[in-house]
Amino acid sequence: MLLTRRFSSALARSPLLPRSLPPPRAVPATPPAPRPPPRRLMSSSSSGWHHSSRPPPPPPSGADKDQLFRGLEAALGTTFSSEPLAPPPQPMILVISGPSGVGKDAVIQRLQEEREGMHFVVTATSRAKRPGEVDGKDYYFVTKEEFLTMIERKELLEYALVYGEYKGIPKQQIRDYMAKGYDIVLRVDIQGAATLREILGESAIFIFLVAESEEALVKRLIHRKTETSDMLLVRVATAREEVKRMNNFDYVVVNSEGNLEGAVKQVESIIDAEKAKVHKRTVNI
């Protein structure tokens, strides 16, 4: 017994043991996980797809057309609009060009006879009238001095010096007819088409008229009998170079001998296709 007390006293004085032990740390209790809310079956009235009150059902199929129409309006809670679904067509600019002798005037004349709502711009020129041409219909025939005045006043959308004579397109004529909803048709030479492409960019439609072959084109130029031999040589040489500009146009239409109607219909198809486009061309003059 005495031995046990001495051992206990010595053990108590030992530096290896702390005099007192700290109280145990309290571990916070983990809160219970929240219970998920009870699942509910979603109905069509509570899904957010419909109003809180179920719409009335449509009338039976035995109803007449007017009752069925009104019943569908009531079921959908709306009225059906009579406004057009497609946006209205916008006025556009059509540029028709090609080498001399391809029949630009013949194609345009048939378009004038076939289609409504189109204005064919009358070009101003300083050259003399040819037999059968009418001032104000085929061209506005002015003197070179008058034409230069129009240039100074910036009255022309485009102008060029072609074979020693001026040709140009009056701006105001285009603005007036586009404001009335008319499509604009411009008949220009290759040089004028290149200038218009720089001015109008992709806002206009460029159509290149061409003969079925080089041989056919030369024969047409000879058949016109409007130029001297020297001028005819210039026309043919120029036409051969102008055909190389075909890639600068949006469409190519072949006006073959004896098939004018086919060429005109193809041009009309191009116009109809452009009218049906979702993304319209925007024109600012």
Swiss-Prot record:
EC number: 2.7.4.8
GO molecular function: ATP binding; guanylate kinase activity
Residue sites binding ATP per the record: G98, P99, S100, G101, V102, G103, K104, D105, N255
Disulfide topology: none
GO terms of biological process kind: regulation of developmental growth
Gene: V2
Similarity remark: Belongs to the guanylate kinase family.
Any single Pfam family the record assigns to this protein: Guanylate_kin
Low complexity biased stretches: 1-19, 40-50
Positions of region (Disordered): 1-66
Main location: plastid
Coiled-coil features, chain-numbered ranges: none
Taxonomic source organism: Oryza sativa subsp. japonica
Acyltransferase among keywords: no
Subunit structure as annotated in this protein's UniProt entry: Monomer.
Keywords recorded for this protein, A-Z: ATP-binding, Chloroplast, Kinase, Mitochondrion, Nucleotide-binding, Plastid, Transferase, Transit peptide
Main function: Essential for recycling GMP and indirectly, cGMP. Essential for chloroplast differentiation at early stage of leaf development. May not be involved in the synthesis and maintenance of the organellar DNA during leaf development.
Location in or out of the cell: Plastid, Chloroplast; Mitochondrion
Effect of disrupting the coding gene: No visible phenotype under normal growth conditions at the permissive temperature of 30 degrees Celsius, but mutant seedlings develop chlorotic leaves with aberrant chloroplasts under the restrictive temperature of 20 degrees Celsius.
Record protein name field: Guanylate kinase 2, chloroplastic/mitochondrial
Pro residues bias locations: 20-36
Residues covered by the Guanylate kinase-like domain: 91-272
